[in-house]
Amino acid sequence: MEFLWAPLLGLCCSLAAADRHIVFWNSSNPKFREEDYTVHVQLNDYLDIICPHYEDDSVADAAMERYTLYMVEHQEYVACQPQSKDQVRWNCNRPSAKHGPEKLSEKFQRFTPFILGKEFKEGHSYYYISKPIYHQESQCLKLKVTVNGKITHNPQAHVNPQEKRLQADDPEVQVLHSIGYSAAPRLFPLVWAVLLLPLLLLQSQ
């Protein structure tokens, strides 16, 4: 019976240890002003993209930031120019949603059971860029994600403290982070413990 529950227990532990890396995707995030904004993850970690969100009516609807995000190759990342609509990963197009900011999640897993799912490899980098919806901006928002590495600290770019801005994921930026909710809730260790309990009881009999 050991060969049944031991692999499941290992899977439970690996899932419980997965980290979530949050990126606030908007032009006020000073991280996007760096030339090489990079997030380092491990396999089975999550990347949570928090879309632009406005709590009140102080910003006109036409001025609200909306983006189409693409997953692209390195050369397209450098040029900040996607080559195909097939590269669309998400749309951030609900900046005034009543429930709060949209959260879009990517799981960096080696294999996926879904036909349209993405698979990732250790030691590889993956690239995301965005294009504004309904308005034009000169700033290119782009992100590099490297699988299997440690998070490095990059100097924070200068930000005008008087500038009205959206949230940023840099902990040194004194802003209040709203909480978004994922459509795929994370499995907690307690749930796995309940699922594994019948197998452990069978072994003890």
UniProtKB/Swiss-Prot annotation:
Keywords: Angiogenesis, Cell membrane, Disulfide bond, Glycoprotein, GPI-anchor, Lipoprotein, Membrane, Secreted, Signal, Tumor suppressor. Gene3D superfamilies: Cupredoxins - blue copper proteins (2.60.40.420). A lipid is attached at S182 (GPI-anchor amidated serine). SUPFAM superfamilies: Cupredoxins. GO terms for biological process: angiogenesis; aortic valve morphogenesis; cell migration; central nervous system neuron differentiation; endocardial cushion to mesenchymal transition involved in heart valve formation; ephrin receptor signaling pathway; mitral valve morphogenesis; negative regulation of dendritic spine morphogenesis. Pfam families: Ephrin. One of its GO terms (molecular function) is ephrin receptor binding. Disulfide bonds join C51-C92, C80-C140. Belongs to the ephrin family. This is Ephrin-A1. It comes from Mus musculus (Mouse).
